[in-house]
Amino acid sequence: TDSIKETIKETVNHQAEWPY
């Protein structure tokens, strides 16, 4: 479903914002 893809995109965005 597109929901999963949207969730992944949001997760990636969060990871990019959180410099580890």
From Swiss-Prot:
Biased composition (Basic and acidic residues): 1-12
Keywords (A to Z) from UniProt: Stress response
Induction pattern: By cold shock.
Domain of life: Bacteria
Region (Disordered): 1-20
Name assigned to this protein: 21 kDa cold shock-induced protein
